[in-house]
Amino acid sequence: MQGLGALFLLLTACLTLKADNVPTLPDIQVQENFNEARIYGKWFNLAVGSTCPWLRRIKNKMSVSTLVLQEGATEAEISVTSTQWRKGVCEEISGVYQKTDIDGKFLYHKSKWNATLESYVVHTNYDEYAIFLTKKFSHRHGPTITAKLYGREPQLRDSLLQEFREVALSVGIPENSIVFMADRGECVPGDREVESTSFARARRAVLPQENEGSGSEPLITGTLKKEDSCQLNYSEGPCLGMQQKYYYNGASMACETFQYGGCLGNGNNFASEKECLQTCRTIAACNLPIVQGPCRAFAELWAFDAAQGKCIQFIYGGCKGNGNKFYSEKECKEYCGVPGDGYEELTRS
């Protein structure tokens, strides 16, 4: 197989793209005297390059993952298990790849998109690194090619990184579509990632200014940014006013109301639910259920439907919802990583 199961997942993302300007795929030669038994075991996916245009859009979300290759249930199969961070959660994905009459070449057929993937082990010394190339053929959308670099350890020699770059370029992958991924460490399936403040701020910044809540200035001064206050408990302050405000509840991942006295307090204090969500919501909200709430307002909003893997419209009642609530389709896609059909496949390594 192109054993590295991640390859087919990247390629299927391009099934929704037109094949305009995609070059004819080159012939690929497998590793000379390929030894299948020696390719088994654990690998780290360290770099990727592809003619699939979606890669450039989501490359900053990709990180080093692990992949284990083993003998399959039959002599004609190879078992593949990939573990990676995706949308803040550690996921484990398993697959089966079919051997061919060429040692080092493997097939995977994705019936949902009527696409066949051909994967090739093109360079490896088995004990240190491996480079895979995968062709994807779609009857509707034409061909794409993806290259991936794997290592037995999370770091490799610079000369091997350069070799991978040269291989990718040689098959028509653009320089700006070659990504050496960040190492966030190994994960255990089901674990949730602790999102750093700087990463969260950078992610939220993708929303254009006109889509963000206007809101008021922070209620306290100093070096603390508004978004850094999101994990604080709400504070009514010492004054005796009765202003309804919103605060972000990290436990429920929702913005809830409280009575603000009118002075002091802290930065977890927002004039509207929209401003609160657009300041404090994290990518974990995309995994929450879609909740209309018990109130009877009629607001047409957007939410991410995890079952369908896309953003959909729903009617929000106006109260007691959660963070999976967006004020435009664009905002939903920016947060939940849905630039187009097939995005989910692309983000899996």
UniProtKB/Swiss-Prot annotation:
**Pfam families membership:** Kunitz_BPTI, Lipocalin
Q: Name one GO biological process term.
A: protein catabolic process
The disulfide bridges present are 90-187, 230-280, 239-263, 255-276, 286-336, 295-319, 311-332
Signal sequence interval, chain numbering: 1-19
Instruction: Read off the SMART domains from this record.
Output: KU
**This enzyme's EC code(s):** 1.6.2.-
Per its record, how is this protein called by name?
Protein AMBP
Its source organism is Rattus norvegicus (Rat)
